[in-house]
Amino acid sequence: MATGSVHSSSGNGRSQAATVVDEFTAPGDKKSLLERSRPRVQALFPVLFTVLGSLETFHQSEVKEDGEKPCRIWLQLKGGKQAVGRAKEYLKGICEPEMEEKQSYPKEMHCIFAGAQGSFLNHLIRDTYANVTVPDIGVLSMKGGTEPVVMAQSRVQQFIRLFNDNVSLPNHKEPAVKKKFKLYVEKHADKYTVDLLLLPSALKSELLSLACDDQLSGEDFSRQSSDDKVESQVNQKDEVSRNGAGTPVTELTSQLDSVFSSVAEDSPCLMERPYSEQDRLSVKRRSSEAEERFSKKPFSLEAVQVDGPVNRNADTNNVPIIDLISEPSDFEDSVILVEADDNVSSETEYKILVNFFKTMGYSQNVVEKVIGDLGQSEEPLKLLEEIEKQSKKELYSHPSSNSTELLKARGTSNLPKCKIAIAEPVQQSAAPLKTQCKALLATDKAGPSNSSHDKSQTKATVANTIPQDQKTTIAPTERPLNKHSDPPLTGVQIFQNSLKVEYRLELKNEPGKLDLKHIIIDGSNVAMSHGLKHFFSCRGIALAVEYFWNKGHRNITVFVPQWRTKRDPYITEQHFLQQLQELGILSFTPSRTVLGARIASHDDRFLLHLAERTGGIIVTNDNFREFVVESPMWREIIKERLLQYTFAGDIFMLPDDPLGRYGPKLDDFLSKQPINRTMHSSSPSSNEMFIPRDHFAPPRAMAPRNGLNQPMTQRNGLSQPMAPRTELNQHMAPRTGLNQHMAPRNALRQPMAPKTGLSQPIAPRTGLDESSLFQLIKPQEPFPPAVHNIARPRPIIPPQRSPSETMELREALLKIFPETDQRHKINEILSAHPYMRDLNALSAMVLD
């Protein structure tokens, strides 16, 4: 900023060494902008910013006669030395920037610069003292001096790199960073809270370091203006009320965090802010009348003053016990021993999770199933989303039973209102109840060796503490205490554990083999197969590519839909897609989104088209049944050029006989020129080497013993010999009562073996051995007689469906699949297959 004059001085009194006053000039036409920016500057930097006036105010001799605006105005900054310097650089970016840059970023990162109530953007400005604004989603504008702008741009580019690479922290650091980041974001909760929690862990760590490192080293100065004091008090009140306002997301996570551990002690930069409990309760979600009739069961110590007392006993090391008894049958799940230190057992955490989601109105069976599948260490938000999905599915499948169960869970039954032991007359009976609670939990932690006598005695003691009116209404049910102590291991957990083993895709830079066919990999099929049909595992694609590369293939193409590049928690290790695309191996099939609906081309068609052009092999476990009638060439590809696979963990495996036990071996199947396995043929064609099983048929006649190459005549369109059938032909035909001209399928592959009651081996007087038999079967024509003898009619393509038929099929499919998320898929299938009328086939495509 070009200054007309710069004046620096220090304050007087005790703050003389700490407070600095800097006066400088700015362009006169920026006066209104600076006055509007005054609150923003003072909020970003601990300084007192004042617009003093124009230079003409202090130099009356320089007043202009034409009444024009003054060229320069005086500005004053008062505060710590470092804070004043940074604020001055920031004002320089507002008034007279030396450098202006625009930086684009992925739209998914907009939550960083607009979320957390603008906290991260403010920290970025304080750290780099550049004027950083967000003119539009996906674009950042940076103005100021050269050094501040370069620093800000470098910091933003680092964020973008971590986001695009989806970098994760080491396993021992990631949980602590996630907890600290979640605590910080919830203190600045807004509509971007969920998006911020889904960021990569390395980016979360970088944002936390930005927020924690941005601490001005200068001491705070005392502001002399009473207006500034009032403004700071108002801002503080607004901030307190804002932090006290709980949202459904913060309600869920804060209650769990308050029981599990106190994360705030680990992060000095994240300070707790006091708030009123009544303010927080005033903004909770509205509950129904049925919910108000029953008392809630919170499992957080912060709500104890409202829902129940915390009783401490000096004999048990001041371990707090929450008395939450709503039903005698739920006694074991309601009374939870919360230890004061951090070593909370997994069994206690499991009970806390189950009971917490039960109080939200969800069925216990659904809650236990979801926690068992995902694990109790999963993020609460993901658990809540999955529980909501499972509840909707059960509601659709069993509407009558589930609705009754949900109504009971939400408190709409006719049971009497349960009372919490708060009143003084009940305290005498509550004391032995607490003793029994501790004994109950102590035996529960001991394991499954508890005797039934102890359980019954404990339940009898507990029953005596319950009021008489509740005893007659509710009958407790006997349940094992350790029913859910050990959640079952799931395939999802095994897959997630396998991802912890590091894998790198390294392809050797060496020439391959030229006689190998083009390999076309169905990326979606391979990725979902490796991800156990639950995750889109990009590692599976990399393993398949590495397998074929090591076998010498260099013509490899992988097809993956374009929308798989979007961030999704169910798509793992997306960096493999980027690596394969850079190598020219991966190709994305087109897809786009219009008004929230995805429009994607069928990637299977790209596989078949490329296989038709290159003569390649398609690696997939799909059978492509919907494309069999499209063209004869595609039908041949589907029959003869599909290569199936399997995964054994991270090991990609292929069968030795891709087309069956009588088909070619894997090396022959992948080679352009199959290896000649006969003794008399030097370079046979592929048709001579192998005929698919559907084409197997015996030769209609064999040549006589005195000649192998007799001329053939045509009769009824089939090849017939001129000589009569010889004894060799009689031996070749089975004698089981079937057609004489029908031979077993392995007649072209194996010599005849002696069987009781069937054909006998070839007589020695014929002078034919095994090699002569193969030479005898080999024709002199380009194709074997078996292929000529089979009538292969061209498939008849049915007429295209009429609009009315399409509407009928769509209505029928919607009745079968009433879920709303299936409608778009049904429309895609009907538009992609305009000739198909089979409702069963269409239903199978929807299920795929």
From Swiss-Prot:
EC number(s) recorded for this UniProt protein: 3.1.-.-
Organism this protein belongs to: Xenopus laevis (African clawed frog)
Protein task: Potent suppressor of cytokine production that acts as a regulator of innate immune signaling and inflammation. Acts as a key negative regulator of select cytokine and chemokine responses elicited by TRIF-independent Toll-like receptors (TLRs), thereby limiting inflammatory cytokine responses to minor insults. Has ribonuclease activity.
Domain KH-like: 81-165
Family: Belongs to the N4BP1 family.
CoCUN: annotated segments: 801-848
This protein's UniProt keywords: Cytoplasm, Hydrolase, Immunity, Innate immunity, Nuclease, Nucleus, RNA-binding
Localization, UniProt: Cytoplasm, Cytosol; Nucleus; Nucleus, Nucleolus; Nucleus, PML body
Any single GO CC term annotated in Swiss-Prot or TrEMBL for this entry: PML body
Domain of life: Eukaryota
Enzyme class, spelled out: hydrolase
GO biological process: innate immune response; negative regulation of cytokine production; negative regulation of proteasomal ubiquitin-dependent protein catabolic process; negative regulation of protein ubiquitination; negative regulation of viral genome replication; regulation of innate immune response
An example Gene Ontology molecular-function term: mRNA binding
Protein name in UniProt: NEDD4-binding protein 1
Annotated PANTHER family: N4BP1-RELATED (PTHR12876), NEDD4-BINDING PROTEIN 1 (PTHR12876:SF26)
Residue ranges occupied by any RNase NYN domain in the UniProt entry: 516-668
Gene3D superfamilies: 3.40.50.11980
Ranges annotated as biased composition (Basic and acidic residues): 220-241
Biased composition (Polar residues): 1-18
Region feature Disordered, mapped onto this chain: 1-21, 220-249
